[in-house]
């Protein structure tokens, strides 16, 4: 239960709705009278959910791929930068259109074709990411309290679902206040870990582009994973808000937090922490007082990330054309997604967490890279057009370019370059194989192919 003082602080908003009122807007354009907020708020909105243990552990995965500490830091910084640029740009579209990101996606995919990326986003965000982050939060709570993991999972799920159920205004407030605690705690953690780090260049081998590509792909998959939500949290801003200010605040918030914590993870797993449950191993490298604060931060950070995941995952579900007939259908879908995602976190994530998390991150990049490429090319080609008439409810817009480019590029890139390395299951594309030397070029290939295919189809089908 939230403290009364906190609830009182959240009552006041710049718009007509209170922060604790259940949101009834879903994918319809936000009316001018309900627009509120400032662009700089987006920095904390996108910093807070990244101040969590999953972000730290990506740095560890880059080290496990075969990179030394400096190579790992450069790899994750590059992956984050590539993702943050498009995340910032897509965020800037929200105030103009007033609708969620997956509704804007209709301009390239059409109303029916957009079911494909919207449904994928629902599975990945509302269920997949929810399960992963719930697990890291539950690990922290178990380490902190000695509760059974199942009990910790239940507690984390309930907190997340309640926050996402209430909706946009409450989430904005929660992220803003969580940011201050998380930023202070993880800043201290960063100083401690950096001071204990080993900065030699081991493994003392030649630079491996394959291992480097995996490090970049892991960071890209994580940070780009927020992009299907980009406009969801800017659509309430006044239409006159500066697109540049929106893009910079959102992009920098994403890049700064992810790069800092992934770098801490790379340093930590390059010689500071030992074996064991990831959260326990990480906390054991810290002074006892800081370990307690950090475990609380990991739990809060997982909630901070997942209220965005489950909220926007349900937006994607509704954008796919689901009709429930209830004004509160968004809130209802939050509960459903929480139950399904929570169920997965009980049974599928605790075992082999490292391998499942790595595979999940790479898979996120496999579908996101083509989708992002298609939207980038579409926006460039439609410069000067009235996008709103293509994406609003009731629009008859159709497009074959988006779905074809998406399916073909994803299928070809995965069949050629994808890799899945689990203790019991291995899969390799036609042009890759075991070991870090082969790398993972799936996302890059998918991006280039999707951009080219969509460009050609658009030009052919839009000849005047």
Segments (PLM) and residue ranges:
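Hydrophobic, membrane-embedded alpha-helices of multi-pass small-molecule transporters
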Residues: 39-56, 190-196, 205-268, 288-309, ...
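Transmembrane helix-loop boundary segments of multi-pass membrane transporters
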Residues: 63-74, 139-153, 169-178, 279-293, ...
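Juxtamembrane transmembrane-helix boundary signature
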Residues: 76-109, 117-124, 455, 459-462
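Helix-loop-helix connectors at the membrane interface of multi-pass transporters/channels
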Residues: 102-106, 112, 134-151, 238, ...
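Loop-to-transmembrane helix boundary motifs in multi-pass membrane proteins
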Residues: 256-257, 320-350, 393-413, 417
């Amino acid at each position: 239960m939230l403290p009364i003082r906190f609830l009182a602080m959240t009552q006041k908003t710049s718009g007509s709705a209170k922060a604790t009122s259940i949101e009834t807007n879903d994918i319809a354009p936000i009316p001018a009278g309900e627009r509120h907020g400032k662009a700089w708020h987006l920095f904390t909105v996108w910093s807070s959910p990244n101040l969590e243990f999953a972000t730290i552990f990506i740095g560890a995965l880059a080290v496990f791929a075969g990179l030394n500490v400096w190579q790992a830091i450069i790899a994750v910084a590059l992956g984050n930068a590539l993702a943050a640029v498009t995340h910032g740009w897509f965020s800037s579209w929200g105030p103009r259109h007033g609708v969620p990101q997956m509704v804007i996606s209709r301009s390239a995919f059409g109303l029916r074709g957009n079911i494909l990326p919207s449904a994928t986003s629902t599975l990945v965000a509302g269920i997949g990411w929810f399960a992963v982050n719930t697990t890291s939060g539950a690990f922290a709570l178990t380490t902190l309290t000695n509760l059974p993991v199942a009990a910790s999972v239940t507690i984390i799920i309930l907190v997340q679902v309640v926050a996402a159920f209430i909706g946009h205004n409450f989430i904005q407030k929660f992220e803003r206040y969580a940011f201050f605690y998380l930023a202070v705690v993880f800043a201290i953690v960063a100083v401690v870990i950096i001071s204990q780090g080993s900065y030699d260049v081991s493994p003392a081998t030649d630079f491996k582009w394959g291992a480097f590509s995996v490090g970049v792909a892991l960071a890209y998959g994580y940070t780009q994973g927020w992009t299907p939500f980009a406009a969801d949290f800017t659509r309430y801003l006044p239409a006159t808000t500066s697109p540049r200010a929106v893009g910079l605040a959102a992009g920098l918030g994403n890049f700064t937090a992810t790069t800092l914590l992934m770098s801490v993870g790379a340093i930590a797993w390059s010689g500071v922490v030992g074996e064991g449950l990831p959260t326990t191993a990480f906390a054991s490298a810290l002074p006892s007082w800081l370990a307690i604060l950090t475990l609380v931060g990991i739990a809060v950070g997982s909630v901070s990330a997942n209220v965005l995941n489950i909220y926007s995952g349900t937006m994607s579900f509704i954008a796919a054309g689901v009709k429930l007939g209830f004004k509160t259908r968004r809130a209802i879908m939050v509960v459903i997604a929480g139950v399904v995602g929570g169920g997965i976190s009980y049974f599928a994530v605790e075992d082999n967490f490292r391998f499942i998390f790595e595979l999940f991150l790479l898979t996120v990049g496999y579908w996101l890279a083509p989708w992002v490429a298609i939207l980038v090319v579409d926006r460039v080609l439609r410069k000067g057009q009235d996008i709103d008439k293509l994406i609003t409810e009731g629009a008859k817009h159709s497009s074959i370019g988006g779905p074809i480019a998406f399916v073909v590029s994803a299928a070809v890139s995965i069949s050629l370059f994808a890799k899945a390395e689990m203790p019991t299951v291995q899969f390799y594309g036609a042009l890759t194989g075991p070991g870090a030397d082969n790398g993972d070029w799936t996302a890059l290939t998918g991006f280039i192919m999707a951009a080219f295919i969509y460009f050609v189809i658009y030009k052919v089908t839009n000849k005047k």
